Design a protein with these regions (language model features):
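Catalytic/RNA-binding core of pseudouridine synthases
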Residues: 1-191
């Protein structure tokens, strides 16, 4: 049985490092158009992954694009690594650390107990280096130009925030959360609560 991209398919992509979600959609759209010898096809993704994130990206084609909101509304689980003792303006590795914190008092129990405080409904402000739009413009575009923007908080739900490994200053974790959660903000807040 062949794939019918025009009627609609869901494609699961393991997004590579440094690719944007739009890069994946664009490349896939062009490949499908070329393979089927057509000029137009609907292709979209169910949730944005940061360029510096790797992992599952749900791509929908044709009539399946009508279900994108359904898929993007599902809970997500992220696995990552954070460095204790510093933060960056972008909350990730896109920018260099600009704030440093003392870490002598931080131990394994403090990290684990602090992570538990984030489980449940919380208010989170998306980072300025994000795909959130302000007046029709993506925040990351404004941030890269040095434009200061006030970002409103949003309610999100963290279902689990588990610390899987601690090798100071690096901490590995897994986090299961609702739509709209910015993982980089969550671990930046964790680091701030430890100080």
């Amino acid at each position: 049985m062949g794939l019918d991209f025009q009627t609609g398919e869901m494609i699961l992509i393991d997004k590579e490092l440094n690719w944007t979600s739009f890069d994946v959609v664009s490349k896939l759209r062009n490949s499908i158009k070329k393979k089927l010898n057509i000029k137009k096809i609907k292709v979209g993704h169910a949730g944005t992954l940061d360029p510096l994130a790797t992992g599952l990206l749900i791509i929908c084609t044709g009539k399946m694009t009508k279900r994108i909101n359904e898929f993007s509304g599902l809970n997500k689980t992220y696995v990552g690594k954070m460095t204790i003792g510093s933060t960056t303006p972008s909350y990730d590795l896109e920018t260099k650390p600009n704030v440093y914190y003392p870490t002598e008092h931080i131990n394994k129990n403090l990290i684990i107990e602090t992570a538990k405080k984030f489980v449940g409904k919380i208010e989170q402000k998306p980072p300025v280096f994000s795909a959130v739009k302000k007046d029709g413009v993506r925040l990351y575009k404004l941030a890269r130009k040095g434009v200061k923007v006030e970002v409103e908080k949003r309610e999100i739900i963290i279902h689990d925030f588990l610390i899987s490994s601690i090798n100071f200053p690096e901490v590995e974790f897994s986090l299961t959360c609702s739509k709209g959660t910015y993982i980089t903000v969550s671990y930046t807040h964790l680091r701030a609560h430890e100080t």
